[in-house]
Design a protein with these regions (language model features):
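Short amphipathic recognition helices of helix-turn-helix/homeodomain-type DNA-binding modules
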Residues: 293-342
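Recognition helix of helix-turn-helix/homeodomain-like DNA-binding domains
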Residues: 258-275, 299-302
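Short, basic-rich loop-to-helix N-cap that marks the start of a DNA-contacting helix
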Residues: 271-285
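Glycine-/small-residue-enriched capping loops at alpha/beta junctions
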Residues: 1-103
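A short, Lys/Arg-rich alpha-helix, primarily the initiator
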Residues: 211-250, 327-343
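Phosphate/ribose-phosphate-bearing ligand recognition and processing surfaces
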Residues: 80-201
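The alpha-helix within a helix-turn-helix
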Residues: 243, 254, 284
């Protein structure tokens, strides 16, 4: 854990290992493969692959990364698309899993994948994306590994049209309306309404006669110690209480929240831990909180939902519609170019 989608050139990703979509003969291909060879150094990488020879379909082998910012290149032999009836899904999942196993074997903390088989291999992008997400998610739930899925465009995403349309409508109803407020339209209406209310009150006072207000009671300054005694639960205290109340294992929660074990340990050991907002929202999804419960959790960390934040409205939509799969939430956020939840 965690698993994140990024939009980047895979040859520039500073992970411990990057994955090359390879053929059985480990020869340089086109597209992503060619870009990796050129960035790593064609002669060195070609010689290294020739020394290995061949690799079976659905498996992966390792070479040095040479001039790339990564340490290793995992060459995953991907299937071409032949209609889906020739074991392509199992072979593609196997290629991902084999590369992930290499990451563990070479003690990598991070690995970056392109969307395997989706280019010149002809695999339908939505199906390729779903296999990538499912295979990677299953693996990182059991291993401490950060995995990046590097995507060039939104066309790879498996967001159903119905869900996307529903989110789009929700954002239009809330986020766009709030932006109207920021341009002054809503504020102007409220000012006019408030002015009318004050005029009506003034007229009432003139008719009834002004009544002097009672003297205000003197305010007693509260000591700093008193204020500290009345602090609410800290974020850490509230988070651990929510986990206990639900009878969940810590590991279940941080994995469902796209949080690494190391990150959770830091939170757990520090009562005054100050999380990032995306971390709080990730735990809200991982704990399957309601919107009201999420508001309380945010408050414990010094945050609140922002009406001017598209990310916040997307998360609120997911909470309202009980979408608690962190990868589905992050896919929607990625679709709208918003920061994803988790580490």
């Amino acid at each position: 854990m965690p698993f994140l989608m990024i939009r980047n050139d895979i040859t520039k990703v500073a992970a411990d290992a990057i994955v090359n979509p390879a053929n059985r003969n480990l020869l340089q291909g086109s597209g992503t493969s060619r870009a990796i060879y050129q960035a790593a150094g064609e002669q060195e990488l070609t010689a290294s692959c020739e020394a290995i020879g061949r690799c079976d379909l659905g498996r992966a082998v390792c070479t040095p990364a040479f001039a790339l910012p990564a340490k290793y290149i995992f060459h995953a032999v991907c299937p071409a698309w032949h209609g889906g009836g020739f074991g392509e899904a199992e072979q593609l999942a196997g290629a991902y899993h084999s590369a992930l196993e290499l990451a563990a074997e070479y003690h990598c903390e991070s690995v970056a994948f392109p969307l395997l088989s989706s280019g010149n291999y002809g695999y339908p992008k939505e199906q390729a994306f779903r296999i990538a997400v499912d295979t990677i998610t299953q693996y990182v739930m059991e291993h401490d590994l950060t995995v990046y899925l590097v995507l060039y465009d939104r066309g790879s995403l498996a967001v159903s049209r119905k869900l996307f349309a529903s989110v789009e409508e929700y954002i239009d109803d809330h986020y766009v309306a709030q932006n109207d407020e920021s341009y002054g339209f809503g504020r102007r209406r409220r000012e006019l309404s408030e002015r009318r209310r004050l005029l009506e009150e003034d007229a009432a006072v003139l008719m009834l006669g002004a009544v002097p207000a009672p003297a205000a009671a003197p305010r007693t300054a509260r000591s700093l110690e008193s204020l500290m005694d009345n602090l609410g639960e800290s974020f850490t205290t509230r988070l651990l209480r929510l986990i206990d109340e639900r009878g969940l294992k810590d590991s279940t929660v941080y994995k469902q929240s796209n949080i690494s074990r190391q990150h959770f340990s830091k939170i757990q050991c520090n009562r005054d831990y100050n999380p990032k907002k995306k971390t709080v929202l990730a735990f809200a999804v991982g704990l399957h909180l309601s919107e009201d419960e999420t508001i309380d959790l945010l408050k414990s960390a010094g945050y609140a939902f922002s009406d001017g934040s598209k990310r916040d409205w997307i998360v609120r939509y997911c909470l309202e519609h009980k979408i608690y799969n962190i990868n589905q939430v992050n896919t929607l956020l990625f679709e709208y170019d918003q920061e994803q939840l988790g580490a």
